[in-house]
């Protein structure tokens, strides 16, 4: 046999707390909706535009070969700019360095 003991004051207090919590969450949702809907969508910035243009340039020869056409690339495609200094050449193996210095 089950027994249920309920205090009306406790139930009223719990319901009030839940209503307050619900209104707080609703206010937070409304406050966050403005800042999240104003974000740029993917592809609406300069970086995405540059990547799309580069992808178009690299996909163009593949598309032409699939279609069976041999067209020259238009002058609109440019390689990515070099950033920073060029890499230095790799060092030769240790035995080679030793002979080159004639110290061994």
From Swiss-Prot:
Designated name of the protein: PE-PGRS family protein PE_PGRS60
Domain of life from the UniProt record: Bacteria
Organism: Mycobacterium tuberculosis (strain ATCC 25618 / H37Rv)
Family: Belongs to the mycobacterial PE family. PGRS subfamily.
Matching InterPro entries: PE-PGRS_N
Ranges of Basic residues composition bias in the record: 94-104
Region (Disordered): 64-104
Free-text function comment from the UniProt entry: Binds fibronectin. May contribute to pathogenicity.
Taxonomic lineage of the native organism: Bacteria, Bacillati, Actinomycetota, Actinomycetes, Mycobacteriales
């Amino acid at each position: 046999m089950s027994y249920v003991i309920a205090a009306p004051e406790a139930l009223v207090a719990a319901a009030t707390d839940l209503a307050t919590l619900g209104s707080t969450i609703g206010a937070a949702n409304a406050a966050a909706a403005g800042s999240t809907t104003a974000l740029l969508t993917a592809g609406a910035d300069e970086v995405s535009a540059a990547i799309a243009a580069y992808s178009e340039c690299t996909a163009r020869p593949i598309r032409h070969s699939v279609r069976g056409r041999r067209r020259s690339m238009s002058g609109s495609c440019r390689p990515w700019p070099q950033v920073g200094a060029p890499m230095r050449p790799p060092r030769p193996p240790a035995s080679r360095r030793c002979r080159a210095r004639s110290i061994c």
